[in-house]
Structure formats: structure tokens, C-alpha cells
Amino acid sequence: MTSTEAGALRRLAPPARRFLAHRKGVLVRLALWSLAESGQAFLVGHAVARSVDEGFLAGDPRRGLLWLGVALVAVLSGARVVRGVFAQLAGVTEPLRDGLVRHAVDRSMARAAPGGPGGTDRAAVSRLTNQVEIARDSFAGLVLTLRSFVFTAAGALLGLLSLHPALLVVVLPPLAAGLALFLVTLRPMAAAQRRALAADEALGEHAASARAALRDLTACGTGPGAERHGADLVADAAAAARTLAGWAAVRTAALGVAGHLPVLALLVAVEWLRGHGVSVGALLGAFTYLVQSLLPALHTLMTALGAAGSRLLVVLDRILGPEPEPEPEPEPEPEPELGSGLEPEPEPASEPESGPSTASASAAAFAVHTAAAPAVELRSVTLSYGVRAEPVLDALDLRVAPGEHLAVVGPSGIGKSTLTRLVAGTLAPSRGEVRVAGRVVTGRPAAELAALRVLVPQDAYVFSGTVGDNLAYLRTDPSPAELDAAVEAFGLAPLVERLGGLDATVRPAELSPGERQLVALVRAYLSPAPLLLLDEATCHLDPASEARAEKALAGRSGTLVVVAHRLSSAVRADRTLVLDGIRAQSGTHAELLGRSPLYRDLTGHWNS
């Protein structure tokens, strides 16, 4: 048995015992009706044997027909027995369903209640409408089949013993061998089934993700990697399916041994049995016990245990098992240096959107070397646009390591731009503290803030002046080589040549939105500020240009925070922050696909 199944059995055994202990009366009545079914199985075979030995072979057809009439009455009485069994079965299965529904509702309510984990329990609907019914049906099927096999087998074996003990010597060994072989296959079969399901789910999820992300895979050139990963998943699924098929073959062999070998053994041993005093009627009665009672019950038992049993175990563990713990956010790895982007000489102050000014010597002195401080740190930051308004950000804690590339994603209007404005210092939090390079940004003069960060908004600002002045707006001393390298890194050379070179005059109205964004991105790239904040600053670029720009910015000394416009930005980042209005989650692209339903939804929307 796998550790998963063993753990599930340990968790479920105590509540199962308590549930059955409170329903002893129903179980006793169910056993009494099942005992009647056992008597029915006994009578049918015994009556057939007597009808032959004491009736037809003895020359008394009336007596033979009378015994056959007894067998017929026993068969017809089965309808009343089945009705009684199902009436008592409801007394066990319906309370189980009611208890599971109550537990699922209580669990969902506790999650949403104050002090609970919080968040929407998206699995609650599945548990209430699907998993509870699966558990009810599977439990009912197992009770019926186990009860039927135990009591029918008891009646049939007792009938064989009453006809002649030698019959048990022939029938019991293959029956026990097949049943033992079947029981041996239960554990590895369940483990193989779990592996096959997991492999199939992983393959389906990858196929759906890849199909939805075709545009981004093509733009980022990651198609071959996705193809290799898909091929590995196909191979894993095929291997799991082969293993499952192998155990299924063993189970089929077990069913054949237990279900057909006793009949064959009885046929082969007819002469031996006749020599030991077994009558013809006893042989026919034995065949009746095997074919009409014992073997059908055994076949039903094996089928139910193989399918409904494992399904019931999994579903009950999901409903009654412990709530999965949320995965902890990965701690940012400390970097040895904050970065050399803070230069000691005076620099241009701020980006156009926060008002142009010039960084003074005091601002440069403020930008000291702080190796231990995070590049960005938010401590229980809350922001709301009014006393009675719902907070846009509520008690947000965030640490971004120096040199880290962080992408921020979430639905429109969730607070992504608000977050960048808070970090940039252009917006003050209602509560909490925002630090950049270890310094509180709220209330700092523009010159000091300009030495720490550059914020590039969605609507890029280009002013009337030369191309070089626009690119070097945040630096006073870029060398021609630095300008040329930056222009080349961002693919801006065709635009510069079209305009007439770095000394040519720019007319902003003649530039497209994407061209203006490229100019603003190069400007931010040349800035000495150690922190770059991009608020959907690449939304007007095509995917290839966006990837090229983000690669250049990520390769720059310092920290990069990007409010993502496309999925590819999150894929390229070291870490992604997901804002959903309730909680914030962070992790790599692969980690968030596994634990954040919202991130999976956004991934589908971005790529559709």
C-alpha cells in the first residue's frame, strides 16, 4: 500500500468506526435480511440435488418436481429479500450523505469566517454536488456486494458441505487461490491507477496550457522546450498506462482462476468424486451452487472492490481529510550588494510623470550603499481611497531582493498600478510603510526619490527636443558609446535613423505609441536609479520587442518590477506576485500554475 493510501486509511478509520457504531440497529436488520439471502442460496442448490437423487433418478418425478418447486419458491422469494436489503441500506447510506454534506458546508464556512484561512473555497461546489454523491453511491455498492458475497458464499459453501464434504476439497483450493491473487493485486493496482490518473491530468493540463499559450510560446521562442516537456509527459503517461494494464491483466487472471477454475476442477474430478460416494444429484447441485450463486457473487465483489473501493477511499479522504496547507512564499535570496546603480554625482531627478527636477548633491549623498536592505519592502501596507471605501491593498507584505526581477499580475483594477505608485513614493499608504533600499519613501523630496527609482507608466512621455536629449533625460553624462549600445539593445536603431540620428529633433505626435514606449524604456535603462518600475510600459509593443526590452532591462544592474501586460512577462521574471483582491501569492510561473486558480485563469485570458 502506498503512503498516500495508508495515510488515508488511518485518517478515515476512526470516523468510520464511530459512524457504524451509531447504527448498530440498522446493521443488525441488514444482516438478518442478508441471512435470508444466504438461506435462499442454500435452498436452490440443495433442492436441485434432491430433485435428481430422490425424484427423477429414483423414478419419482412428482417428488422431483416438488423439489424443483422448492427451488423456484426460493428464487422468487429473492425479490422480497432484495427489497428488505435496500430498505435497510438507506438507513446507512443516507446518513452518510447527510454527514458528508454537513462536513463540507462547515469546512467551507470555516474557511470564509473571520480567523479562517480566507479566500473562496472553489472546491466546495464540487464536493457538495459531485464528490458526496460519488461517496454515497460507492459506499452503497460496496455494502451490497460485500454483504452479498459473504452471505451467499456462506450459503453455497454450507450447501456443498451438506451435499458431500469431498466437494469442498475440489472447489475450495482454486477459489481461495483466485481470491488471494485478487487481494494481492489491490494495493499495486490502486497505486498504478493513481499514477496513471496523475500522469493523464499532468498531460492534459500541459496540453491545455500550451494550446492557450501558442502566441507567447512563438514570441518567446520557447516552443521546443514546451514540446520536449510534452513528450516527457506523454512518455510518463504511456508508462503509467502500461503498468496499469499489466496489473489489470493480473486481476483478470485472478478472476479467471476464482471464477472458472472451480467449475473446470469439478468437471475433471467427476470420476474421483463418484468413486468417493458423491451422487449425480450432488454433482448437479454443486454446479448450481457455483454457477448460480458463488461465482456471480465473487465476480461482483472483485469488480466493486477494484473500482468503487479505491474511488470511495479517495473521495472520502478529500472530503474528510485535512485542509491542504497553503504553500509558503519563497523568501527572497539576499544579494551581497544593493547594486552600483546609485552614483555619487548629481543626476536628473525624476521621470516626466512625477514632475522633472534635477538631483542635487544632497540627493546623491542620500543614495548610500546599503548591502543588507531589500530593494523594495512593504510592511502591512493598506491603501483605500476614502474612509468607508474598500481597501485596494489590505495589509500587504512584500520583500523584493536587490537584483530581482518581479512581475505583478492580477485582474484589471485590482491595484497593480497603485502598488507601483506606492513603491515610487507618488502615493502615500493609508497604513503601513513602504521602503526602497531601506529608506521610507513616503514624504521624501522628488530629488531623493529620483535617485532611488524610475517609474515608467503605460502612456510614455516624449518631449519636443533631440533624440539624444529624450534618451539621456535622466542622465547628464552618457557617453556616445553608452547611447549607441542602449539604442542597439532595444532595437531602436531603425527609428533613430529614420528621425535623422541622435541630434535630430523629435516631434512626439509623429511617433507611434510603441515607439514612444521604446524611447521611455531606453531612458529608464540609462538611468542610474537602482530600481525600475514598469507599469504596463510595454503594452504597445509586439511580443518580440517586449521580450527584447525586458531582457535588456533585466540585464541592467539593479532591480526590475514589471506590471505584466502579457503572460510572457511573468514567465521571464524570477518571481511573480499575484493580486486577487483577497490575498497576495508569489512564486515562479510553474509554482503559481500549480497553486493559484486565479493565475491559471489569467493565463488563459492572456493567451486566448
From Swiss-Prot:
Disordered: annotated segments: 321-362
Domain ABC transmembrane type-1, residue spans: 30-296
Residue ranges constituting the ABC transporter domain according to the UniProt record: 376-605
GO molecular function: ABC-type transporter activity; ATP binding; ATP hydrolysis activity; ATPase-coupled lipid transmembrane transporter activity
InterPro entries, sorted: AAA+_ATPase, ABC1_TM_dom, ABC1_TM_sf, ABC_transporter-like_ATP-bd, ABC_transporter-like_CS, P-loop_NTPase, Type_1_exporter
Upregulating conditions: Probably part of the ramC-ramS-ramA-ramB operon.
Main location: membrane
Membrane topology, record value: Multi-pass membrane protein
Composition skew (Acidic residues), residue ranges: 324-336
SUPFAM superfamilies membership: ABC transporter transmembrane region, P-loop containing nucleoside triphosphate hydrolases
Biased composition (Low complexity): 351-362
Localization per record: Cell membrane
Positions of transmembrane segments: 25-45, 66-86, 141-161, 166-186, 253-273
Keywords linked to the UniProt accession: ATP-binding, Cell membrane, Membrane, Nucleotide-binding, Transmembrane, Transmembrane helix, Transport
Record-level GO BP terms: transmembrane transport
Superkingdom field: Bacteria
Residues that bind ATP: 410-417
Function (record text): Probably involved in exporting SapB from the cell. Expression of the ram locus (ramA, ramB and ramR) induces rapid aerial mycelium formation in S.lividans.
Protein name, entry field: ABC transporter ATP-binding protein RamB
Organism: Streptomyces coelicolor (strain ATCC BAA-471 / A3(2) / M145)
